From Swiss-Prot:
InterPro entries: Aminoacid_DH-like_N_sf, NAD(P)-bd_dom_sf, THF_DH/CycHdrlase, THF_DH/CycHdrlase_cat_dom, THF_DH/CycHdrlase_NAD-bd_dom. This is Bifunctional protein FolD 1. PANTHER family: C-1-TETRAHYDROFOLATE SYNTHASE, CYTOPLASMIC, C-1-TETRAHYDROFOLATE SYNTHASE, CYTOPLASMIC-RELATED. Homodimer. One of its GO terms (cellular component) is cytosol. SUPFAM superfamilies: Aminoacid dehydrogenase-like, N-terminal domain, NAD(P)-binding Rossmann-fold domains. The keyword Hydrolase applies. Belongs to the tetrahydrofolate dehydrogenase/cyclohydrolase family. One of its GO terms (molecular function) is methylenetetrahydrofolate dehydrogenase (NADP+) activity. HAMAP family: THF_DHG_CYH.
């Protein structure tokens, strides 16, 4: 590992990398049109009025417009039934104009999210949450890869560092980030340890890591002084403080002088998750729905 003693970390600019990815996707959509090929289509389903979900969904629709995808919006009332949603998903599964189906989580409590996610056809599961796609990743033959881990791999590539053989520590074991992230890093040749907020001697694990990915949803969980000199720090956390400021799961100010590379919050991982959703939708259109 490069030693960055008494230096400040290189910032990994997720915003800029995501913008460049969106530009490439938009260019490809234009080329497809010129070749007389279909425009990629994404269907976004939102159930209820959760304000955070509404913001995320509006971002995703705006992203679709920006790259020239056709986006279909389904804003459904909170009391929508499991059966009505199942029927909608079936209809979208059968619609040849739809390459990706996105079901915005969390869903109202009376709905079974697992059953609904499994109802989405694996070749239209652009979030990469279907057990089939997670299984493909586990078996080292990924098809549609979960967006946040996939975006993080793109950020890691941008550092130019060779990940092969690195000690990687993931803090947080969720289905959406931690677990698939572990599989992505195994695939990249890392030695992977998965921790969580109740891990004994979390500081010790973090201190041995050449690469730390923190996705625990707990502000300030990982202290800057735990970070090994020169390590790569990827902070997936996004927590709003009482003063309205967004902070990650890592104490940024104290990690900055120790890390070799670090993602800011906001402007690090978040934009990449959104860009990878578009990348997956394009991939589905180009490779899976020829």
């Amino acid at each position: 590992m490069v030693n960055h003693a008494s230096m400040t970390a290189h910032l990994i600019d997720g915003k800029a990398i995501a913008a460049s990815l969106r530009q490439q996707i938009a260019q490809r959509v234009v080329e497809r049109r010129q070749q007389g090929l279909r425009t990629p289509g994404l269907a976004v389903i939102l159930v209820g009025t959760d304000p955070a979900s509404q913001v995320y969904v509006s971002h995703k629709r705006k992203d679709c417009e920006e790259v020239g995808f056709i986006s279909q919006a389904f804003d459904l009332p909170s009391e929508t039934t499991q059966q009505a949603l199942t029927e909608l998903i079936d209809r979208l599964n059968d619609d040849p104009a739809v390459d990706g189906i996105l079901l915005q989580l969390p869903l109202p409590a009376h709905l079974d999210a697992s059953l609904l996610l499994e109802r989405i056809r694996p070749d239209k599961d652009v979030d990469g949450f279907h057990p089939y796609n997670i299984g493909r990743l586990a078996q080292r033959i990924p098809l549609l890869r979960p967006c946040t881990p996939k975006g993080i791999m793109t950020l890691l590539e941008s550092t130019g560092q060779d990940l092969y053989g690195m000690n990687a520590v993931i803090v947080g074991a969720s289905n959406i980030v931690g677990r698939p992230m572990a599989m992505e890093l195994l695939l990249a040749g890392c030695t992977v340890t998965v921790c969580h907020r109740f891990t004994k001697d979390l500081a010790g694990h973090v201190g041995r890591a050449d690469l730390v990915v923190v996705a625990a949803g707990k502000p300030g969980l990982v202290k800057g002084e735990w970070v090994k000199e020169g390590a790569i720090v990827i902070d997936v956390g996004i927590n709003r403080q009482e003063d309205g400021k967004l902070v990650g799961d890592v104490v940024y100010e104290t990690a900055l002088p120790r890390a070799g590379w670090i993602t800011p919050v906001p402007g690090g991982v978040g934009p990449m998750t959104r860009a990878c959703l578009l990348e997956n939708t394009l991939y589905a259109a180009e490779e899976l729905h020829k």
